[in-house]
Every structure is written in C-alpha cells, then in structure tokens.
Amino acid sequence: MASQFELSVVSAEKEIFNGNVVSVRVTGIDGELGVYAGHTPLLTSIKPGMVKYTLEDGKEEFIYVSGGFLEVQPTIVTVLADVAIRGEELDQQRILAAKRKAEDTLSKSNNAELSAKLSREIAKLRVYEIVNSKLANRR
C-alpha cells in the first residue's frame, strides 16, 4: 500500500478535487515539482499548465490550471488557481478557436505595440541627447 496524502485543488469558483493521492506533479516557477507523502513543506508559485495526480489504484488524473500557488504541508497539498478545469471537461474545439484568436490578436497588436514602444524610446533618447547637449554647452 503506497503512502498517500490529501490533495485539494481549488479555483476561484469552486473546489475541483479533494481526495487522497499518492503523488502530484505541477510546474513551478523553477521547473517541474513532484510531491509524494512526507515531502518537505513548501509554498511556491506555479505556472499555467497541468496538475497530474495519481490515485492509490494507480489511475492518473489531470487538471488544467491557469497558474497560482502550491502549498505543501505534512498531510495536505493545496493547489490554488484562478482557473482550474478537469482534463475531461476541456473542449478541444473551443481551445483551438481561443488559441487562433489569441495568435491573431498577438500578431496584429504585437507589431504595433513594439513600434509604439520603439517610438517612445527613440523620443526619450532624443530628449536625453538634447538636454545633455544643452547642459554641456552651458559648462
């Protein structure tokens, strides 16, 4: 019998999962984290991605999280996320449509945003050069 611990995955709206597991994997800000019973206490930010947990019978389940926090305590691991969706509830067509929309928006706005930022920085540089040349002429 594998050692188990309680896992709680909570979104801003509801508790997505609460039960006993033998392991959980998430992507922290510094890389992949694997948590097993007896893990050292930990509090860290997690990146958007997958929470993968293994039940005592060996069955693996998956939850998408939009990022958030992972807290590891001696007997319970808690994942707090703004958005958490069970893997089986994800809709591929909706995801692909949202991905395409985001890519289109990024490609349209990215160039304009970069151009505007570059223009602002060039303008700052010009002001800096003018101010410094006038100060140099006063000396």
UniProtKB/Swiss-Prot annotation:
Localisation per UniProt entry: Cell inner membrane
HAMAP family per record: ATP_synth_epsil_bac
Subunit structure and binding partners: F-type ATPases have 2 components, CF(1) - the catalytic core - and CF(0) - the membrane proton channel. CF(1) has five subunits: alpha(3), beta(3), gamma(1), delta(1), epsilon(1). CF(0) has three main subunits: a, b and c.
Family: Belongs to the ATPase epsilon chain family.
Topological category with respect to the lipid bilayer: Peripheral membrane protein
CDD domains tied to this protein: F1-ATPase_delta
GO (cellular component) term, any one: plasma membrane
Alphabetical UniProt keywords: ATP synthesis, Cell inner membrane, Cell membrane, CF(1), Hydrogen ion transport, Ion transport, Membrane, Transport
Known function: Produces ATP from ADP in the presence of a proton gradient across the membrane.
Entry annotated with the keyword Transmembrane helix: no
Listed name of the protein: ATP synthase epsilon chain
Disulphide-bonded residues: none
PANTHER family for this protein: ATP SYNTHASE DELTA/EPSILON CHAIN, ATP SYNTHASE EPSILON CHAIN, CHLOROPLASTIC
